Amino acid sequence: MKFLILALCVAAAMAGPSGDQIAAAKASWNTVKNNQVDILYAVFKANPDIQTAFSQFAGKDLDSIKGTPDFSKHAGRVVGLFSEVMDLLGNDANTPTILAKAKDFGKSHKSRASPAQLDNFRKSLVVYLKGATKWDSAVESSWAPVLDFVFSTLKNEL
């Protein structure tokens, strides 16, 4: 069964976004990737259930924790993982590393994250990107397959 899942992930990677799509998404991402706190804030603001999944933030006022070192550190980890995957995209030799990162994510999040929460995270990320980057139909058509690949790879490990 594990082999089948791995084979499907590799097949998804091979059928993933084109080089041009990856390049356009990376260029867009590079303009906001250092806004880690703002990105996580936007995700939590739109999805309080995701915030409550993190015990250190559950039940706390989002605006009051946004500027704290704990929030900043956690935003760095969450958005940092996405940035690492974005950096690895575009080189087929990096596929095993991407899959390993997804597997690590799955191990650490299996008990507290759901595919639905990842879908909501993705939607909130897109809303953030639309407001914080130059977003047009070309950028959107580049991001869609990149996000499909990244989030399906992560969800496969939950």
From Swiss-Prot:
Entry's Gene Ontology cellular component terms: extracellular region; hemoglobin complex
Q: What GO molecular functions are on record for this protein?
A: heme binding; metal ion binding; oxygen binding; oxygen carrier activity
Coiled-coil region: none
- UniProt entry tagged with the keyword Thylakoid: no
Which Pfam families has this protein been placed in? Answer: Globin (PF00042)
Keywords from the UniProt entry: Heme, Iron, Metal-binding, Oxygen transport, Signal, Transport
Q: Does the keyword rRNA-binding apply?
A: no
- Per the record, the domain of life is Eukaryota
Q: Which InterPro entries match?
A: Erythrocruorin, Globin, Globin-like_sf, Globin/Proto, Mb-like_M
Where would one find the signal peptide in this protein? 1-15
Q: Which residues form the Globin domain?
A: 16-158
Query: Which residues bind heme b per the record?
Result: H74, H109
Q: What else is known?
A: There are at least 12 different components in Midge globin.
Q: Which family does it belong to?
A: Belongs to the globin family.
Subunit structure of this chain's protein: Monomer.
What's the protein here called?
Globin CTT-I/CTT-IA
